[in-house]
């Protein structure tokens, strides 16, 4: 959608925005302003022609958050903190309301259907698909994806080994490493047609269900 509007001249491209393109040698490159970088470290050779290779920032509002003062949050509102999310699985361990938590810092507002990504200590792999509206710590980024990317597919991508390697490599800070906004927007995402996204989601969820069943039988 955004690329089409740029082509039509209805909006202008951000000069600092990162864009992936294919060079005359048929290889992929990343352009950020006047800087052009090779993406030879990423393996795109086996991708079907119907898939697109893009930057995460081209498909979602990465880093654009709405800050809300806790004084303006209702007691019944869901307040999501990092401790509420299980690492690697993204399972919400508990839902705590504002009246119970009495959180005192500014929060990010999120909506049902958004992908909630923890930029703090990305190696913990905490990514949630919101099933209701709420508010979260500022260490969590609510992401709104364009309609040609299913939220659940985006969530699994953000939890994938490829994205984890990238996030850990780009994180800054020793004790409290974080993935910066600029690097988050530059992350490479491969986008299949929606029908294929649905097939991938079903396959992943089936695998998770089988693993859960095995773990239950071994307990």
Which residues are covered by each model-predicted region?
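Low-complexity, Lys/Gly-biased intrinsically disordered segments
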Residues: 2-16, 22, 26, 52-91, ...
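Non-catalytic DNA-recognition/assembly elements of restriction-modification systems
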Residues: 35-67, 190, 194-202, 208-219
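A structural connector/turn signal
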Residues: 98, 104-105, 130, 174
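Feature representing long, continuous alpha-helical segments
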Residues: 152, 156, 165, 174, ...
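A short beta-sheet element
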Residues: 105-163, 168, 180-184
